[in-house]
Amino acid sequence: TNGSGKTLKTIQKSGPDGEITTSFEYDGIQRLVRVTDTEGNVTTSTYDMGDRRTEVNHPASGITSFTYDALGNVLTKQTANLAKEGKFITYDYDYQRLTGINYPDHPENNVKYYYGGRNASQNRIGRLMLREDGTGAIEYFYGKMGEVTKTRRTMIVPNQAIATYVTQWTYDSHNRLLEMIYPDEEKITYSYNLGGQLEKVHGYKSYGYDYVSKIGYDKFEQRTYLKYCNGAETFYTYDPQRRRLQNLTVNSGGNTIMDNAYTYDAVSNVLSVVNGASVPQSGKAGGQMAHTYTYDALYRLVSATGTYTGADNKTASYTLAMGYDNMHRITSKRQILTQNNVQFNGTLNAGYDLSYTYGTETGKKFQLANVKDVNYRT
């Protein structure tokens, strides 16, 4: 860092090709003006006398420029592509409230914003009341605390009739959602326990039904129990030291259909997921599964393996290997899959080996240039 506490350089010492460095430069009043990545790609910024960024030159997107009004609102934006034709995206304001976004091409995609005046109803005084864009319009209604209580969405479907959808919300004094009415008039109600946590979800349309019958929590406010309307129950347990999910069990119809156990590394990356549920009866879906994961020193997924055992002698396994460069771009992805009696009676061996290359020309850096794909199936 420099004397003002600004970061001058970051170094990651465990990249696949050595150190990964990023350098930062500032002007005399500590504004960021230059960033250089580990491959030497440079991003620069310029500012006006009001500390407003007027230009960004990025190795991938080129030069993007901005102009402002006296109050600091963005008036125009010009990307590298628009600059070739001398065009701009423009912005309109009313008392510093954005009222319009105007595109140089396809004006039907312009966006307009309307705000409630002093006589507006439904608590809309000074608030966004209507937004129009190329897809149609959406109207907003508010409660006394400024929460959105209703929207009316009007969609313009080409060669079709105009469609309108109304959605409504009701909240309690703690601003918790109590009720939601969908455009098809289905009403969903939410119930909470004494601690303010969601406990039940109930639906009504012609007749009543529960989506979620019960949710339970522990003293750490982590979910420990969930029961759906069909009777399926999910149980959650956590490790006592770091409160990470340790086991997830799903019971339905008197059977355990999922019994997942999780392990982690010191920084909470998932190392394994093992489903120890019983192998189902003949003809039934499901089964036992196990997955393992490894990571590099930068916590990027390097490899994964998995196995499956189901009814009727169904088995499967896979391996996955990933490669990255110092810019954190994927450079390779290789997967091998073996199945027995899963999709058909017999053995299937399949896989792919992908290699990724990226653009190097100005304006195309970081963009995916080519994918070499090798597939096989036996």
Where are these regions (language model features)?
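Beta-strand elements of repeat-based all-beta scaffolds
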Residues: 1-378
